[in-house]
């Protein structure tokens, strides 16, 4: 199989600068590096292909020969030399030091503390109107005895002899070398010979801290409130993590929430549904009167504008949507049953339809059986 053009492999123009070559190789290597694609032979071959192209095109003499004679003018197997006599492993480390655990030099590594999550349960009223609550959170904080060093008072951590205090060691893997976290000091660059008794050399201790959380009006289940710097303490002087307060709103006995709208089920009597009337409805702002028109059917929705939840982001206020449910009367007396029968008879006697949904359903049933007779002939 013919070898691909080196410029095509890297996806750059033939007049690409050294910075453009480096950027292109970095992108491809991040995508196809064997450590990121274990067992993927295709990615491994693409990485080798990109490496070869980068080595040739970053060497001025080899690039000139390649531009003039193509692949015949260069011998990639001749080595990993590059501009100025630098080895390819140096170039690789320069490009990927931050990906595979740091670069040359530096000191003991610092680590940001882990983020924490706290689940906060609120009532609907607390979520709608906002509130301020106190929470108690377990966390790892800096040891007050050793101030995070992990060493006993009067002593100091020693430099790790394995990595020389860098926290990284270079490992040879096939045709290139990468840096990995030092297995002895675990990346700290230090060894503690006299550990602090309070934290056992960890530099951090577990502690419960009480925090005040301001909950803005309009939050809903799934929302998160971030408290910067209230997570676990960092290592080796690293910055602390953050605390994320996860909101959970408890079910309400009257309302259910959909976005910024509130839903409410309102039972009404048979007489009110037929004759109309006025009901007192609870809202977040107090009580309001809801007019029920004559001949209202069960399931009808009534929307009360701006009686829902104010948006936590400052948008328009939601609505209160009331769904009426016509209740069938129960525990009827003999006289009440007689009156209902009398009403039913008078409704059947006239030619007027009094139950539109029932009449429509009966018409549909009649048509269904007529069709059934046709197909069964």
UniProtKB/Swiss-Prot annotation:
State the Gene Ontology terms under molecular function. ATP binding; heat shock protein binding; unfolded protein binding; zinc ion binding
User: This protein's superkingdom?
Assistant: Bacteria
Q: Where are the zinc fingers (CR-type)?
A: 130-208
**CXXCXGXG motif repeat segments:** 143-150, 160-167, 182-189, 196-203
CDD domains, alphabetized: DnaJ, DnaJ_C, DnaJ_zf
Q: Where is the J domain?
A: 5-70
Q: Which residues form a coiled coil?
A: none
Entry's localization field: Cytoplasm
What are the binding positions for Zn(2+) 1 in this chain?
143, 146, 196, 199
Which cellular component, as a GO term, is one annotated location? cytoplasm
Task: Identify the main location.
Answer: cytoplasm
Q: What does this protein do?
A: Participates actively in the response to hyperosmotic and heat shock by preventing the aggregation of stress-denatured proteins and by disaggregating proteins, also in an autonomous, DnaK-independent fashion. Unfolded proteins bind initially to DnaJ; upon interaction with the DnaJ-bound protein, DnaK hydrolyzes its bound ATP, resulting in the formation of a stable complex. GrpE releases ADP from DnaK; ATP binding to DnaK triggers the release of the substrate protein, thus completing the reaction cycle.
- The protein here is known as Chaperone protein DnaJ
Q: Which gene encodes it?
A: dnaJ
